[in-house]
């Protein structure tokens, strides 16, 4: 539903509809995207905690996969925070250094996004595209299932919006040139939401590789459990023999 709303507003922007209603709509979509990303981040954190717990129990089996999970989170958090800083710079460019990210004042500002993202001194949009593509490639390597890998790669999309061959603009200019501040911020938040989705898919794939959440055993061991820790001379020794199921990998 969120992505559908986003596409509708993007289509309206393509028709140069920058009415206050449309820009306010972008704010609503942006808020929903932020909430969705926060929910996904919490879910991803729990998955990594499960990997960490499994690693404590069986570091030989899980250790390598847990390290991959930590790396997934590290790369995801770094890119998420990089985009967050870009959003703050755009908002402050439009609303001033004391801008409130939850209460955008100059939503219709057409210069802020271009000045930050398309500066001739160093295009942040070009840097962002490279980082998104590098992240997409790194996360794809973490996923074994071909279908899920394809979904993951589609989630981080850096193709130029519009039909192939009909749009002569670059990805950078298509997304940020003369784009109202509210729209640019929403676009960046969408990528943050996509990052949390991709992070979740990568972590889930890693968790499946080590059967996190399953209790699997491959060995039965007999153990003697004495009824008393103290045995007096001449008294009978009593103990129970129990069978324990363990994972010896």
Regions found by a protein language model. Name each.
Residues 244-248:
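Short solvent-exposed strand-capping/beta-turn motif centered on an Asx-Ser/Thr pair
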Residues 1-13, 17-19:
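N-terminal positive-inside, membrane-proximal cytosolic segments immediately preceding the first
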Residues 22-192, 199:
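Juxtamembrane extramembrane loops of integral membrane proteins
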Residues 4, 23-24, 185, 206-214:
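Ser/Thr/Pro- and often Gln-rich low-complexity regulatory segments
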């Amino acid at each position: 539903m969120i992505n559908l709303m986003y596409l509708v507003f993007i289509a309206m922007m393509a028709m140069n509809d920058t009415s206050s209603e449309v820009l306010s709509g972008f704010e609503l979509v942006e808020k929903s995207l932020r909430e969705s990303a926060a929910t996904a981040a919490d879910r991803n954190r729990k998955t990594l905690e499960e990997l960490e717990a499994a690693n404590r129990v069986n570091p030989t089996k899980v250790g390598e996969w847990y390290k991959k999970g930590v790396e997934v989170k590290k790369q995801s958090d770094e890119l998420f925070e990089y985009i967050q800083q870009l959003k703050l710079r755009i908002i402050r460019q439009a609303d001033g250094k004391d801008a409130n990210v939850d209460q955008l004042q100059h939503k219709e500002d057409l210069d802020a996004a271009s000045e930050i993202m398309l500066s001739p001194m160093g295009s942040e949009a070009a840097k962002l595209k490279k980082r998104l593509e590098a992240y997409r490639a790194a996360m794809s390597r973490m996923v074994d299932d071909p279908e899920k890998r394809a979904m993951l790669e589609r989630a981080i999309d850096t193709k130029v919006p519009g039909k192939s061959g009909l749009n002569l603009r670059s990805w950078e200019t298509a997304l940020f040139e003369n784009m109202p501040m509210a729209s640019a911020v929403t676009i960046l938040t969408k990528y943050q939401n996509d990052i949390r989705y991709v992070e979740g898919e990568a972590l889930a794939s890693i968790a499946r590789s080590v059967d996190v959440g399953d209790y699997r055993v491959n060995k039965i061991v007999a153990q003697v459990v004495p009824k008393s820790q103290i045995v007096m001379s001449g008294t009978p020794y009593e103990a129970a023999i129990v069978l324990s199921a363990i994972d010896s990998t």
